[in-house]
């Protein structure tokens, strides 16, 4: 076997070694399976101009693949909307669902590298939870990720990032993400 078989992402190790114990102590869970954990991270990049020119989606797919290390899935319009010149089944964006090690690696890069590079960054809004333990945030520029070469980018795009947890409510989810060093402002 190679060394990669024993590799554990930094945040996964932090979760198993310190975060689980801290969460169990703070909320008093009866057993270890009740402790919230990260389930998945979904990254969505909408490409509205792809409805006019289908070649525009290619750059978004390549950038999303470079950022996540996983091939994105094209998202299509569910129904036609004449006002937006949109047809049903037309490609309008791309998304990636990250789980396991790739999820922890992406989260590590997001917290330690990408968020500090965001212009005028003052922290994340602590009220962007959905009531069921999931946190959603938006980024206006995808070039803050180190995998993106600024000179080769045809257009700066935004992206939506949703962090899904197994927490039952927002309080537990916020405590979990705060343990992962999410820079919440409130």
Swiss-Prot record:
Superkingdom classification of source: Bacteria
InterPro entries the UniProt entry points to: Ribosomal_uL5, Ribosomal_uL5_bac-type, Ribosomal_uL5_C, Ribosomal_uL5_CS, Ribosomal_uL5_dom_sf, Ribosomal_uL5_N
GO cellular component, one term: ribonucleoprotein complex
GO biological process: translation
Single GO MF annotation: rRNA binding
Keywords of the record: Ribonucleoprotein, Ribosomal protein, RNA-binding, rRNA-binding, tRNA-binding
PROSITE patterns (UniProt xref): RIBOSOMAL_L5
Function: This is one of the proteins that bind and probably mediate the attachment of the 5S RNA into the large ribosomal subunit, where it forms part of the central protuberance. In the 70S ribosome it contacts protein S13 of the 30S subunit (bridge B1b), connecting the 2 subunits; this bridge is implicated in subunit movement. Contacts the P site tRNA; the 5S rRNA and some of its associated proteins might help stabilize positioning of ribosome-bound tRNAs.
Complexes and interactors: Part of the 50S ribosomal subunit; part of the 5S rRNA/L5/L18/L25 subcomplex. Contacts the 5S rRNA and the P site tRNA. Forms a bridge to the 30S subunit in the 70S ribosome.
Family per similarity comment: Belongs to the universal ribosomal protein uL5 family.
HAMAP family: Ribosomal_uL5_B
Name of protein: Large ribosomal subunit protein uL5
């Amino acid at each position: 076997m190679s060394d990669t078989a024993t590799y554990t992402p930094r945040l996964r190790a932090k979760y198993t070694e310190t975060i689980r114990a801290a969460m169990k102590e703070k909320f008093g869970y009866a057993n270890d399976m009740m402790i919230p954990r990260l389930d998945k991270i979904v990254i969505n990049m909408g490409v509205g101009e792809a409805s006019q020119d289908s070649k525009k989606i290619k750059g978004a797919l390549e950038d999303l693949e470079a950022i996540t290390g996983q091939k994105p899935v094209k998202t299509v319009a569910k129904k036609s909307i004449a006002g937006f010149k949109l047809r049903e089944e037309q490609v309008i964006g791309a998304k990636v669902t990250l789980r396991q090690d790739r999820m922890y690696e992406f989260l590590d890069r997001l917290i330690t590298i990408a968020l500090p590079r965001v212009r005028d960054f003052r922290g994340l809004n602590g009220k962007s939870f959905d009531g069921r333990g999931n946190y959603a945030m938006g980024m206006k520029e995808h070039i803050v990720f180190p995998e993106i070469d600024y000179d080769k980018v045809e257009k700066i795009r935004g992206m939506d990032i949703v962090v899904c947890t197994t927490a039952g409510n927002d309080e537990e989810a916020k405590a979990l993400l705060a343990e992962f060093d999410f820079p919440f402002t409130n």
